Amino acid sequence: MKHSYIAKRFQSSGAGLSLDTEALAKYKDIIDLSIGDTDFTTDESIINAAFRDARAGHTHYGDPKGDPELIDAVCRAWEEDFGQRLPRDHVLVSASSCLGMALVMLAILDPGDEVIVFSPYFPMYREQIELAGGVCVDVPTYANEDYAIDEARLRAAITPRT
Protein backbone atom coordinates (compact mmCIF):
# COMPACT_ATOMS: atom_id res chain seq x y z
CA MET A 1 0.00 0.00 0.00
CA LYS A 2 1.46 3.35 -1.04
CA HIS A 3 -0.07 5.43 1.78
CA SER A 4 -0.75 3.78 5.08
CA TYR A 5 -2.40 5.28 8.10
CA ILE A 6 -0.65 2.79 10.34
CA ALA A 7 2.66 3.92 11.84
CA LYS A 8 5.69 2.21 10.29
CA ARG A 9 6.74 0.82 13.66
CA PHE A 10 3.55 -1.26 13.69
CA GLN A 11 3.42 -2.28 10.03
CA SER A 12 6.02 -5.02 10.37
CA SER A 13 4.77 -6.43 13.64
CA GLY A 14 3.42 -9.94 13.79
CA ALA A 15 0.02 -10.98 15.03
CA GLY A 16 0.58 -9.16 18.30
CA LEU A 17 -2.14 -9.88 20.80
CA SER A 18 -4.58 -11.35 18.31
CA LEU A 19 -5.59 -14.90 19.00
CA ASP A 20 -6.21 -17.65 16.51
CA THR A 21 -9.85 -17.93 17.59
CA GLU A 22 -10.62 -20.55 14.95
CA ALA A 23 -7.93 -22.85 16.34
CA LEU A 24 -9.02 -22.19 19.92
CA ALA A 25 -12.69 -22.86 19.14
CA LYS A 26 -12.07 -26.61 18.90
CA TYR A 27 -11.05 -26.75 22.57
CA LYS A 28 -13.54 -26.81 25.44
CA ASP A 29 -13.31 -24.96 28.75
CA ILE A 30 -10.35 -22.73 27.89
CA ILE A 31 -9.67 -20.05 30.47
CA ASP A 32 -7.62 -17.18 29.04
CA LEU A 33 -5.22 -16.03 31.74
CA SER A 34 -3.24 -13.72 29.47
CA ILE A 35 -4.88 -10.35 30.10
CA GLY A 36 -6.76 -10.64 33.38
CA ASP A 37 -10.23 -10.96 31.88
CA THR A 38 -11.90 -13.35 34.28
CA ASP A 39 -14.29 -16.10 33.28
CA PHE A 40 -16.85 -15.02 35.89
CA THR A 41 -19.18 -12.05 36.28
CA THR A 42 -18.29 -9.32 38.74
CA ASP A 43 -19.96 -9.84 42.12
CA GLU A 44 -23.32 -8.07 42.45
CA SER A 45 -22.18 -6.13 45.54
CA ILE A 46 -19.36 -4.55 43.51
CA ILE A 47 -21.69 -3.72 40.63
CA ASN A 48 -24.20 -2.14 43.04
CA ALA A 49 -21.45 -0.11 44.74
CA ALA A 50 -20.35 1.22 41.33
CA PHE A 51 -23.95 2.20 40.54
CA ARG A 52 -24.30 3.97 43.92
CA ASP A 53 -21.08 5.84 43.27
CA ALA A 54 -22.26 6.91 39.80
CA ARG A 55 -25.64 8.01 41.15
CA ALA A 56 -23.82 10.06 43.80
CA GLY A 57 -22.22 12.09 41.02
CA HIS A 58 -18.86 10.38 40.71
CA THR A 59 -19.05 10.41 36.91
CA HIS A 60 -16.46 13.04 36.07
CA TYR A 61 -12.73 13.01 35.49
CA GLY A 62 -10.89 12.55 38.73
CA ASP A 63 -7.60 13.87 39.99
CA PRO A 64 -4.91 12.85 37.46
CA LYS A 65 -2.76 11.58 40.33
CA GLY A 66 -5.57 9.37 41.62
CA ASP A 67 -8.44 9.56 44.05
CA PRO A 68 -7.16 11.10 47.32
CA GLU A 69 -9.06 8.56 49.45
CA LEU A 70 -7.55 5.70 47.46
CA ILE A 71 -4.07 7.18 47.76
CA ASP A 72 -4.52 7.45 51.54
CA ALA A 73 -5.70 3.82 51.65
CA VAL A 74 -2.66 2.70 49.63
CA CYS A 75 -0.35 4.56 52.03
CA ARG A 76 -2.05 3.01 55.08
CA ALA A 77 -1.91 -0.49 53.56
CA TRP A 78 1.77 -0.07 52.71
CA GLU A 79 2.58 0.97 56.26
CA GLU A 80 0.53 -1.89 57.74
CA ASP A 81 2.05 -4.49 55.41
CA PHE A 82 5.67 -3.31 55.35
CA GLY A 83 6.07 -1.16 58.46
CA GLN A 84 7.29 1.78 56.37
CA ARG A 85 5.69 5.16 55.85
CA LEU A 86 4.85 5.82 52.20
CA PRO A 87 4.54 9.54 51.40
CA ARG A 88 1.38 10.49 49.46
CA ASP A 89 3.47 12.13 46.74
CA HIS A 90 5.12 8.77 46.04
CA VAL A 91 1.80 7.23 44.98
CA LEU A 92 0.27 7.61 41.54
CA VAL A 93 -2.99 5.80 40.85
CA SER A 94 -3.62 5.21 37.17
CA ALA A 95 -6.77 4.22 35.32
CA SER A 96 -5.36 0.75 34.64
CA SER A 97 -2.28 -1.34 35.22
CA CYS A 98 -1.50 -1.13 31.49
CA LEU A 99 -1.46 2.66 31.61
CA GLY A 100 0.57 2.63 34.81
CA MET A 101 3.17 0.25 33.39
CA ALA A 102 3.39 2.23 30.14
CA LEU A 103 3.93 5.46 32.09
CA VAL A 104 6.67 3.82 34.17
CA MET A 105 8.44 2.51 31.06
CA LEU A 106 8.21 5.89 29.33
CA ALA A 107 9.56 7.60 32.46
CA ILE A 108 12.57 5.38 33.15
CA LEU A 109 13.74 3.85 29.86
CA ASP A 110 16.18 5.38 27.43
CA PRO A 111 16.39 3.97 23.89
CA GLY A 112 18.13 0.59 23.97
CA ASP A 113 17.75 0.02 27.72
CA GLU A 114 17.02 -3.62 28.46
CA VAL A 115 14.24 -4.85 30.71
CA ILE A 116 14.27 -8.42 31.97
CA VAL A 117 10.84 -10.03 31.82
CA PHE A 118 10.20 -13.50 33.18
CA SER A 119 8.05 -15.60 30.89
CA PRO A 120 5.33 -16.50 30.75
CA TYR A 121 4.26 -12.89 31.16
CA PHE A 122 1.39 -10.49 30.56
CA PRO A 123 1.26 -9.88 26.78
CA MET A 124 1.46 -6.09 27.04
CA TYR A 125 4.82 -6.03 28.87
CA ARG A 126 6.82 -6.45 25.64
CA GLU A 127 4.78 -3.81 23.80
CA GLN A 128 5.10 -1.31 26.66
CA ILE A 129 8.86 -1.78 26.86
CA GLU A 130 9.35 -1.51 23.10
CA LEU A 131 7.02 1.49 22.78
CA ALA A 132 9.26 3.30 25.28
CA GLY A 133 12.34 2.42 23.20
CA GLY A 134 13.49 -0.41 25.44
CA VAL A 135 14.46 -3.96 24.62
CA CYS A 136 12.52 -6.83 26.19
CA VAL A 137 14.85 -9.58 27.41
CA ASP A 138 12.86 -12.76 27.91
CA VAL A 139 14.04 -15.03 30.73
CA PRO A 140 11.97 -18.21 30.70
CA THR A 141 10.50 -19.98 33.69
CA TYR A 142 9.04 -23.46 33.47
CA ALA A 143 6.11 -25.35 34.95
CA ASN A 144 8.32 -28.31 35.89
CA GLU A 145 10.37 -25.84 37.97
CA ASP A 146 7.24 -24.32 39.55
CA TYR A 147 7.93 -21.15 37.52
CA ALA A 148 10.77 -20.32 39.89
CA ILE A 149 13.35 -17.83 38.69
CA ASP A 150 16.57 -19.62 37.80
CA GLU A 151 19.52 -17.57 39.03
CA ALA A 152 21.86 -18.75 36.24
CA ARG A 153 19.37 -17.79 33.51
CA LEU A 154 18.79 -14.44 35.20
CA ARG A 155 22.52 -13.68 35.53
CA ALA A 156 23.08 -14.65 31.88
CA ALA A 157 20.47 -12.09 30.79
CA ILE A 158 22.05 -9.15 32.62
CA THR A 159 24.15 -6.78 30.49
CA PRO A 160 25.42 -3.22 30.96
CA ARG A 161 22.15 -2.04 29.30
CA THR A 162 19.92 -3.84 31.83
What are these regions (language model features)?
Residues 100-101, 125:
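Short, hydrophobic alpha-helical packing/hinge segments within bilobed ligand-binding/sensory domains
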Residues 37, 68, 98, 122, ...:
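Residue-level detector of flexible, active-site-proximal loop/helix-junction positions
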Residues 1-9:
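Generic N-terminal amphipathic, Lys/Arg-enriched alpha-helix
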Residues 4, 34, 55, 78-80, ...:
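A generic, residue-level signal for flexible/boundary positions that often mark functional hotspots
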Residues 5, 56, 73, 116-120, ...:
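Alpha-helical structural elements
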Residues 89, 106-161:
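PLP-dependent aminotransferase-like
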Residues 25-28, 55, 109-110, 159-162:
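Short conserved AdoMet
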Residues 8-96, 103, 153:
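N-terminal small-domain helix-loop-helix segment of the aminotransferase-like
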